[in-house]
Structures are given as structure tokens and as C-alpha cells.
Amino acid sequence: MNDAPKHPLIERILNLELAMFLSVPVLQKAGCQEHPEEFKRTRRAQFLTWSEKTLASYQEDLLQAEAEGRNLMTHKYARMDGLIPKLEDNPLIDRIVEIEYAWQKGMFHRYPRLMGGARPLASAEDSPFQTSFETYLSGELETYSSQTLAALFQDMTQALAEGRSMTEDLYTHLVRSYGYASLEEAEEAAAGNGPIQG
């Protein structure tokens, strides 16, 4: 697949997100705020799995929030920490979380060493020191518009029909950005060097 046409759109999204991310209040600060290039690396890997339609819709979400003086990153982390009520009650959120949870679980089974630094899976594993994948994802999805959620769900439905995991695609992009040829190579390297943090 040729991802080149998506790159300018992704970079615009990353710049919008990073500006919001770096403005998140200190009490909600994430460790990667000290390393913005790592934030962009991880987010870029995620956005490379999205269609241009979904990317364009999310960019519009960011631009609209910016115009209205809303910081979607602040809202996401506030939801993760239970500081504000639910932002969005779209039924697609639960369906997306269910699919991505299964994909993420599959990554833990297939690449346990590589995934050793990843968030715990279930919200039941949340603690004051660590937020689970499930809680993090739900908090992020609640900041998306209905249009973006619908477009993302369409991407995921297509991936399922093709027998693909968008989560595996994400991690493939991520390990390649670190110089590995494949997930298998990164898994082997993780045995000696430790997992990629994510």
C-alpha cells in the first residue's frame, strides 16, 4: 500500500495534536510530553493505519476544537483520570474498543517480549500509577466526532473483512521507524534489549 498521499495530512494532524498535547495541565502530564518526537512517532504509526477519509475527519475535529478553544488532549487525559464526565455516548465507541482490545490482546500473545512495555489491557488493571489500554482508548475515542468514529469503524470493518489487524499494522509501522524489518525481528531484539515502550 502506498501511504505517501497520506503523509502531509498526517503531519498536519501531528502538529495540531502536539500543540494541544504540550499544553495539557501539569497534573495530567504524560511522560512523553518530555519527548515530543516519541509522541509523534507513536501517533504517526497509528495514523498510517487510517484511511484518508478518517484522517481528514479527525483533522476537522482538531481544527474545530482549536477554533473553539478546546484542547482534545486535555479532555482525553481528564477522562482517563476520571476527572470529567463522559464526553460522548456513541455506541460505536464500545464496538471499536471491543475490536481493538482483541487485536491488542493478540499482539500480547504473539509478541510478548516486544509488548512487555505496553499498557495493561483491561480497565480492571487501572491504578493511580498506570492507565490501561482499554481506559486510554475509550478516553481518546470520546474526543472524536461521530463522523470520525463512523469513518474509523469503517476502516476497522474493512480490515476485519481482509483478515488484517490494524493494531498489528500500527506496531509494524512503529518497529520499522526504529529500524527493524518486521515485528518478528523486533520481538527477537526485545529479548536482549527490552521492549519498545508504548
Residues covered by each model-derived region:
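Short amphipathic alpha-helical linker/capping segments at the junctions of internal repeats
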Residues: 69-84, 166-179
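Alpha-helical oligomerization segments
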Residues: 150, 154-198
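Surface-exposed, interaction-prone regions used to assemble/regulate multi-protein complexes
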Residues: 64, 75, 83, 114, ...
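A cross-kingdom feature marking solvent-exposed beta-strand/loop segments within repeated
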Residues: 26-49, 60-61, 72-73, 132-141, ...
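Polar/charged low-complexity regulatory segments
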Residues: 2-33, 83-84, 90-124, 176-179
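ADP-ribosyltransferase catalytic core
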Residues: 60-70, 155-159, 163-164
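Conserved binding-pocket/active-site segment within a compact domain
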Residues: 109-161
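Short, structured motif recognition centered on aromatic/hydrophobic residues
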Residues: 47-63, 96, 141-144, 148-156
